């Protein structure tokens, strides 16, 4: 097994980590501040340059929460220092995206345009300069929220399996099916 929870979580000088009495972890960095409630049964030891998560017993529940707690804190540290970014590509004739103020306006082959207002913690932009397909860029410091917003945009028109038209992640491979063949 990986035993990922036993590894210490390093953080740099620009990051400050604090924990209150209810196991609410607050991490501040150059890009912002994130707060997360960690399971109260886990204990957190904060040193000068790292955090260690400890579990009370070796029960299955505690082992799983141990790794989860560590992963959540690692994602928070990475978010406040580097941030997260997801890119989506819009493929299809007449499929377009553009920003109007804070709202993302997308034409995806429906009879009406779709207006998507992202949460305030996430920045959404459109890059139309990379060839013929528009690219939607979702950025933020909260990994879960960035992934959730990107998945919601993708779900507006998922790639269809015959021509691959729709919204997909830039690095996503969509396997295409063969069409019908004529009878002989």
From Swiss-Prot:
Keywords: Ribonucleoprotein, Ribosomal protein, RNA-binding, rRNA-binding. InterPro entries: Ribosomal_uL6-like, Ribosomal_uL6-like_a/b-dom_sf, Ribosomal_uL6_a/b-dom, Ribosomal_uL6_bac-type, Ribosomal_uL6_CS. It comes from the Bacteria. One of its GO terms (molecular function) is structural constituent of ribosome. The keyword DNA damage does not apply. GO terms for biological process: cytoplasmic translation. The keyword rRNA-binding applies. GO terms for cellular component: cytosolic large ribosomal subunit. Belongs to the universal ribosomal protein uL6 family. This protein binds to the 23S rRNA, and is important in its secondary structure. It is located near the subunit interface in the base of the L7/L12 stalk, and near the tRNA binding site of the peptidyltransferase center. Part of the 50S ribosomal subunit. This is Large ribosomal subunit protein uL6. It comes from Salinibacter ruber (strain DSM 13855 / M31).
